[in-house]
C-alpha cells in the first residue's frame, strides 16, 4: 500500500495488522480485511500465486482473471495456513485510490438486533460501503465509545471511491438508517478519528502487552459467519455464553 498509494492505486485489502503483515501470510490465512464489503476478501483479490510444496517443488498458478472451467485451484492454497504449501508470491487486483472522497457515518442504538436489521437492509438495497460495522457496548468501550454511547451499541459505515459514488452511497445509507426510530446520529469526527486508528503497528502491540499485564485481561477477534436469519442469535450466544457458563 505504501508503494501503491502515491501512484493513485490500492489493493483494497486492509487488515488491522496491515503495518506488520506480509501478503503471503494474509493469503495463507484467508484474511478478510476491514474494507471487504466493498472490495471483497483476500480470496476475491488473488489472481494467481506461487508456492513451495513440502517436497521443495515450486508451483505457480497462472495470473488470469477467471477460470473458464473446472475447479479453481487457487482455493486449494488460499487459506491453507502452511499445511499444504508456503506461499511465496501473489498477484492481486488493483483499484483506483480516492483518499479525499471518504465519508464517515455513525449511529448509536440500544440493541444489536435492529443494528443487524439495518445492515441487512443496506446490503439488500445494493449499497457497498467500504466499512460496515456494528459494535456491542462492551466492544465499543474498548474503542472509547463509552464516552458518548455508554451501554449502547454503535453502528458505523464508511464509503469511498469516485466522489459521486461515495457521496451517493453515503446518502443512500443515511436515508435507510435515519428512517429507523431506534437510532441516534453520532458526530462524524468521532467516526473519522476511529477510522484513523484502526490499524495496529508494533507500538500498539507493545501497548496491548502492557495493558494485559496491568489489567490481567485480553481480547481477541473471532471471525463468525452466519446468515441474516441466525446472526443475531449467534451474536447473543457468542456474547453471553462465556460470561454465564463459567
Identify the residue ranges that each predicted region occupies.
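C-terminal substrate-recognition/cap domain of FAD-linked oxidoreductases
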Residues: 92, 96, 106-239
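Proline-centered helix-kink/hinge sites
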Residues: 15, 241-242
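FAD-binding subdomain of flavoenzyme oxidoreductases
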Residues: 1-133
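Single conserved hydrophobic/aromatic residue that forms the stacking wall/gate
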Residues: 238, 244-246
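Non-transmembrane, interaction-prone segments in cytosolic or luminal domains
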Residues: 5-8, 32, 156, 195-197, ...
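Intrinsically disordered, low-complexity segments enriched in polar/charged small residues
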Residues: 35, 242-243
Amino acid at each position: 500500500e505504501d508503494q501503491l498509494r502515491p501512484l493513485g492505486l490500492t489493493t483494497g485489502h486492509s487488515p488491522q495488522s496491515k503495518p506488520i503483515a506480509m501478503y503471503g501470510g494474509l493469503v495463507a490465512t484467508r484474511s478478510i480485511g476491514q474494507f471487504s464489503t466493498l472490495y471483497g476478501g483476500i480470496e476475491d483479490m488473488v489472481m494467481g500465486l506461487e508456492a513451495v510444496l513440502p517436497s521443495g517443488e515450486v508451483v505457480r498458478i497462472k495470473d488470469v482473471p477467471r477460470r473458464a472451467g473446472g475447479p479453481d485451484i487457487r482455493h486449494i492454497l488460499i487459506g491453507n495456513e502452511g499445511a499444504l504449501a508456503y506461499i511465496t508470491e501473489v498477484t492481486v487486483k488493483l483499484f483506483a485510490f480516492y483518499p479525499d472522497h471518504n465519508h464517515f457515518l455513525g449511529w448509536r442504538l440500544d440493541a444489536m438486533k435492529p443494528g443487524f436489521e439495518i445492515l441487512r437492509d443496506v446490503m439488500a438495497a445494493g449499497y457497498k460501503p467500504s466499512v460496515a460495522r456494528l459494535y456491542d457496548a462492551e466492544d465499543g468501550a474498548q474503542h472509547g465509545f463509552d464516552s458518548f454511547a455508554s451501554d449502547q451499541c454503535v453502528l458505523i459505515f464508511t464509503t469511498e471511491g469516485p466522489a459521486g459514488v461515495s457521496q451517493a452511497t453515503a446518502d443512500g445509507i443515511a436515508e435507510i438508517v435515519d428512517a429507523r426510530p431506534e437510532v441516534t446520529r453520532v458526530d462524524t469526527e468521532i467516526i473519522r478519528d476511529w477510522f484513523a486508528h484502526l490499524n495496529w503497528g508494533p507500538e500498539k502491540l507493545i501497548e496491548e502487552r502492557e495493558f494485559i499485564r496491568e489489567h490481567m485481561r485480553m481480547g481477541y477477534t473471532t471471525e463468525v459467519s452466519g446468515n441474516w436469519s441466525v446472526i443475531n442469535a449467534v451474536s447473543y450466544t457468542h456474547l453471553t455464553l462465556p460470561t454465564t457458563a463459567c
